[in-house]
């Protein structure tokens, strides 16, 4: 089996996209409770479409490691973001690499959005909520109560992640996917070093 090596141009593209992604990671828009929207995975998705999920994983990893330099979550937020980003770029990148059409991109983004939303729900349930509860001395019931102020039907942490985390991540990934669809083709010559 022959290994594929990255070219100098690909490494340069990875570095540039990772740097842009790391900067975007610091620009957060508060949405609801402690959830914030950022577009740092946009360059990662562009990398997945241009070069595939392998190089995109490097972009995502570099962004996450750089995010550790200014984290307030002691790395847990970056880990959750990495898991969601990977769940997005793997199917999106693989599908688009096999079907390099607008429809292939759309199908890849839809499958990736579903996978990333599920990863977001599970990483919040198993990582983020327990972590924030431990760090801030909040029992899970108190975090659930925060959610109940928005949606009274929430009864437990599963309800919290299904009614708040899931919809938030779905909207986040739909927005990132929409922007990706708008900018990939115009940026494609730059990403493929044709411009």
Annotated model-derived regions:
Residues 1-195:
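Loop-helix junctions at membrane interfaces
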